Amino acid sequence: MHDIVILGGGSGGYACALRASQLGLSVVLIEKDKLGGTCLHRGCIPTKALLHAAEVADTAREGENFGVHSTFNGIDMSKVNSYKDGVIGRLYKGLQGLVKSRDITYVEGEGKLVAPNAVEVNGQRYEGKNIVLATGSYARTLPGLDITGRIMTSDQALTLDYVPASAIILGGGVIGVEFASVWRSFGVDVTVVEGLPHLVPAEDEAVSKAMERAFRKRGIDFKVGVRFQSAAQDAEGVTVTLESGETLRADLLLVAVGRGPRTENLGYEAQGISMDRGFVLTNERLATNVPNVFAVGDIVPGLQLAHRGFQQGIFVAEEIAGLAPQTIDETGIPRVTYSEPEVASIGYTEAQAKEKYGEIDSYEYNLGGNGKSQILGTTGFIKLVRQKDGPVVGVHMIGARVGELIGEAQLIYNWEAYPSEVANLIHAHPTQNEAMGEAHLALSGKPLHAHA
């Protein structure tokens, strides 16, 4: 019998396997598709590769602004996809080598939980003192909306071999705005349809409104607070009807309405595991109601992020090894949307902080006062939220490259830093990171390149 049998080789599963192996535990890692899961093959990595290609396209267009003679002459999707697949391939090869170098039994095939301590794959049974469920997620659709032909999810959109003339995107969350950003840079006429009142609705309202202004400026059309009714496709394109009666027409429809847990027909319910709408329920130590069965990643309710999966996988390995690791604060997990402009945040929004703490202070530092942001030609801001006379409880940013600032932001939040403590740290000039220091100087009552 093995110490751990892990079902699923995505971010959560393989992180658990690697850490458990480091700790001297015997590990079986089972994956039906490719090691690395959604993030590496159909999510984070390929989308960010497309977003970088989009940034290069925009740079070519804007060269004259900097005195550089450059023009944008179109997109060759076969070369874009070759670049994207090359990035994936190199990372995949590296990950395979990493798993192979550890004492991990890697099993290819579709596994099913057949007992509280056993998974069956290809007719073979693997028993473990502990089971870790890490089967990930799939791209959702809406009832009655079949994914076929010109109606697609991110899975199909990532392998498109042409640039559509126009696209409708159903969903204005992270996936929707990232694809809107890529396609607009590639020259596509894009319309985003979002049922909630704002784009990126999970973000602080100030950030959502700034994103909407930026999208208007980029020529990305969007409709918020409107509901989808139906879609019909023909040889030329897709017609989308909204509940308001308005119809939209485009070459294709991207359904970006979130991701669902991949837990059907895997034996979870049959073994008595508590579920809710397909998600596996756990306590704060990621243990299910069945002894010695744990769950990590997208099947656990909460943020569906690869780095959350990594951390949960490491946590469970250490928990099983008896190290009693510190529980994970979900609010302290950084969130980044890699559109143009980028959005990055951690902690509570202003509205959430008011609800939780009552009295708060907030401050927005405009990137207009930041030298490096002026050099890059970006606009945006860093918004800080603090408890009244207390630590910083939220950092919310929008602007080019602000995702690179989230590292310091997550230290500030997770170490419960006061604005005055961050203000005393010296930030290099001229960097965008300097804006983080300036924001904290201002919030602690001693603004430098900012109005109080």
Predicted stretch roles:
Residues 1-10, 163-173:
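Beta1/beta-strand and adjacent pyrophosphate-binding region of the FAD-binding site
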Residues 2, 18-25, 30-164, 191, ...:
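Glycine-rich flavin
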Residues 5-7, 111, 126-136, 169-170, ...:
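Short hydrophobic core segments
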Residues 7-10, 16-33, 38, 45, ...:
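Flexible, glycine-rich terminal cap/loop adjacent to redox cofactors
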Residues 13, 176-177:
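N-terminal Rossmann-fold NAD(P) dinucleotide-binding loop
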Residues 17, 21, 180, 184-185:
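Gly/Ala-rich phosphate-binding loop of Rossmann-like dinucleotide-binding domains
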Residues 148-164, 247-322:
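FAD-site-proximal beta/loop scaffold in flavoenzymes
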